[in-house]
């Protein structure tokens, strides 16, 4: 994308987020700030749209939260001047783990424990929404949503999804462009490998194709209407293309339950 195109998208997102908040009676918004790029860009967008005094963020750490994530999240809050707090949700996860072992009659599987973390974060944000009257912003992107790489009732919680119509590759571009205006995002949050940090050493690309591959396939299939055969013919591995398309259709049940994504126009 050109600088002009990115500026247009950013301004449209700002306008649409402000309009959505006004129309629904919200002056303030809240999000989970993870130290990753998606929540980082959403926090900056919210500050640009509403003013930093109307943005509130929680870093909800667990045993898998890296020191780098804590440092990055704190730096983003400092650069942009919004309300920020760190809370430790590991004790809640540990209690849930013990409770579920009793329910199951055996130890919970890793996938259960991973999703517990995301759901505890979502539950905490929604509790804050009830307590303080904030609109919760979901921080998922179009790539994750298409692949179902998200936790229902966890990171999908929220009243609106500001970047839900942006592929991950576009978010990297948009972040770099936004930093040309002023330093709103630490370079480390743009450079680091994406990770949900729900287990030790976890990386997005352990579960998904590289984003530049995934997003090109998704754009060809969803936006350009190309067939599987046409996408393969353009140079992608048949196995990868088939997996992406099948996963997209398999994960429709998740997309049906995610918040509305802001329009880019």
Please tell me what each predicted stretch does.
Residues 1-34, 41-265:
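ATP/NTP-dependent adenylation/nucleotidyl-transfer catalytic domains that generate, transfer
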């Amino acid at each position: 994308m050109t600088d002009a195109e990115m500026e247009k998208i950013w301004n449209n997102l700002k306008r649409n987020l402000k309009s959505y908040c006004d129309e629904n009676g919200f002056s303030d918004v809240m999000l989970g700030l993870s130290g990753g790029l998606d929540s980082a860009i959403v926090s900056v967008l919210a500050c640009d749209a509403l003013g930093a005094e109307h943005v509130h963020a929680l870093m909800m750490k667990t045993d898998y939260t890296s020191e780098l994530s804590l440092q990055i999240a704190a730096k983003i809050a400092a650069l942009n001047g919004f309300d920020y707090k760190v809370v430790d949700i590991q004790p809640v996860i540990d209690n849930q783990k013990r409770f579920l072992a009793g329910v199951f009659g055996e130890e919970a599987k890793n996938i259960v424990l991973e999703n517990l973390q995301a759901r505890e974060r979502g539950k905490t944000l929604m509790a804050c929404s009830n307590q303080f009257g904030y609109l919760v912003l979901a921080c998922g992107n179009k790539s994750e949503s298409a692949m179902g790489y998200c936790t229902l009732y966890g990171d999908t919680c929220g009243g609106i999804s500001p970047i839900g119509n942006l592929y991950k590759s576009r978010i990297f571009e948009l972040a770099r462009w936004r930093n040309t205006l002023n330093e709103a995002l630490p370079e480390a949050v743009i450079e680091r490998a994406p990770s949900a940090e729900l287990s030790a050493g976890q990386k997005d690309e352990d579960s998904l194709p590289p984003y530049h591959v995934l997003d090109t396939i998704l754009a060809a299939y969803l936006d350009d209407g190309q067939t599987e055969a046409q996408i393969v013919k353009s140079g992608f591995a048949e196995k990868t293309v088939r997996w992406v398309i099948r996963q997209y259709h398999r994960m429709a049940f998740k997309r049906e339950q995610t918040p509305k994504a802001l329009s880019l126009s």
